[in-house]
């Protein structure tokens, strides 16, 4: 015989068991089930020999015997997020997962006859194994033809540029680092009860051709790429790159809509100087982004600002433009929920969409050593994830994660945190039906610079 994982419905809900298929008789099946699952009582209806030979799972109900509590776990656990997530998983489809398995077997050929799991192919062509395969983001399809990007709900694009950094370089390798560690993740999140593979379509379009020795030409390339992706209807996800790209990304988004855009910006630094070293460096993006007519500074919210790396030259611009600033002390005093509420109120006030810019250095440098301007005293990882989830619930028109510098990282933990910010954002929007909500604001054709 052989085993198969099956899902069965009981009076208490669905359960999954490994079912032994014995191509002889129901009696043999019963004895096999008792040997594999001694804690289960099994009720079955007679199956024909033909159905057994076809390896169809027997329709049955199961009654787990759970340590003196009858058919129920401890009453208090029925109300936990953990148990509700387990129940909600049963509602998720598995169609695309199965299609991916079949595609892998078709393209990668069938596995050796010695391998019992016939869902495995000879060549790695899908999600598994996590240590193999080509490093696209989350092993999403690589779309070389940009004309096809609109076929997907979201598109990942790399902006490998560190020509705007003023201290430690290396963020040009950020997109590679994030893609590499993204192989670690599956598309399913237990707590959210979200499966990105089943509930959305994601692609990776590769990297923008940046010009290392020319900031302005690189900015034009980035604006064109983001504008094109947004105009196609796909949700743009930009992998930085230093934070100088925060200006051209917003410019690209703003170029394909007449609507008003707000910005929620996580950072330890204000990034609102007009110039730094006579150029538009990574300390300047929001001076220039908020000069765009449909991106007013009063809709800019900056979360986590503070410490010893905020240049005084930036502060008069914050006052003059009336931006909305939240320090770490504010977060500690007000709490995460209140800060998120204030951020949403300000960013969305008279706005039609919100762009998310997440600088990885907003997180305490003990957790993200791989960045250009590390600063102690920032957000803890769970605080960052909580805040991102709260602001993403209302929907976004695009996002970027910047300042990941793999040469200064340890064991990929900074890249991993950047990855988590992205997938939590996507998962939150999927869970709340907000992915794609930006499409109605796209009312202008894409015009390259």
Identify what each model region corresponds to.
Residues 2, 58, 136-140:
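Aromatic-residue hotspot detector
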Residues 70-449:
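Conserved alpha-helical scaffold segments that buttress catalytic/binding sites
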Residues 4-7, 16-70:
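N-terminal mitochondrial targeting presequence
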Residues 1-5, 399:
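Conserved small/polar residues in nucleotide/adenosyl-binding loops
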Residues 12-14:
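Hydrophobic alpha-helical membrane-insertion segments
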